[in-house]
Amino acid sequence: MECVMNSKKIIQLSTTQKIMLSFLCAILVGSFLLALPISSATGEAVPYIDALFTATTSICVTGLVTVPTYSTWSVWGQIVILFLIQLGGLGVITVMYGVMMGLHRRLGLGNRWMLQDVFNLNNISGIVKFLRKVLIGTLVVEGCGALLYMTVFVPGYGLRGIWISIFNAVSAFCNAGMDIMAEDSLCGYVFQPMVNLVTMLLIILGGLGYIVWWDVLRVLKNIRSQKLKCFRLLTLHSKIALTVTGILIVVGAAAFYIFEYNNPLTMQDYTVPQRIWASLFQAVTTRTAGFATIPQEDLTNTSAIISVLLMLIGGSPVGTAGGMKTVTIAVLLVSMFATIGNKEDAELFGRNIPKQAVNKSVAVVGMFFIIASLSTILLSAVTDADVIDIVYETVSATATVGLSRNLTSMLNLWGKLIIIVPMYLGRVGPISLVVAFSTQKKNKNIVKNPTEEISVG
């Protein structure tokens, strides 16, 4: 009888709890597998704290590493890491239901409601078809990316280049930023057009989100004339995501070009085209990808601060990227200017922004700053690194970016444990909690407390 009651309690877990529990279970299983001697390149078990850190950074698609991925882990260990990255990028529950579909098992109404919460959709109509598109689209994009990578990595690494290409394609699309080539990420390919272009495209596609994908494809499929009006046919969500993404890439690249132009440690000796490549890549990768073509510790303080801001913003909702999200920031800014202008409603692209969306945006931004601030305070208590390096590390962890100013590998036990927490919370907390709140029924109390004016600002 007690077992039946416990099973009912598990079934009655909210979507948020199931998401958080699924990621936690994946981390624990992944850390156990990585702690086995077979996962180590030397045949000796890696310390469990490093296995736990690697499992967390993989499933949370962060990319911060305490040990070199290419030299520490065996092929089996790298396969485990790649599986965790794919699992984290798509979402544990998404993959689980994808497997059920592959086994021809029917998804019940409860399963469809959960997928609605996971993808943050308005209804469950066509949810199974949407899931199928997500899974197939992911495999197609990653496969194309791997094939393009092979044109560079196979000539350079031989047959091993095939595995490197597959690993990098999945890691880039999932915005994980982990690679198995060298300690300095993609710094050796800073001037390689194919590697730069493919990596940036995979990062952007993964970061835009699946909703934007299918909305753009829908418009392109149905449009027959007046192509200049394609943008008008997109949903408000897609318009915001595409616009903010474009602005951040262009403005970010211009800022890095300006502030790194005379930096002797980075771009001073580069040609103009090389500076453009490096600046573009930095603007794209800081939006939660984690790959690097220039050493992050060599950036000027101004560029480091710009990188922190871009990391905080991150990608778009319902994608593989982390951060506060482009749409969240856009809604918050529009709402702020509406308040300043004494406007009753926040408007964007000729549409009013729902009050609920504004409230969610405030909640997401607030939670991110709380998590990042507490992590910064705690990490500064256990390490004597520079403040800019600590802030860079904690924001990178919270926004699941993976860029570091050479601090991750020097963390002690407490430092590693501190960084593990924001990586996990950044992946499941600010996102899934807001989704859960939006699906809960409001308490409509018959008696309401009186309202009283207060002074703010």
Listing of model-derived features with the role each one plays in the protein:
Residues M1-G457:
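Membrane-proximal intracellular helices of multi-pass ion channels
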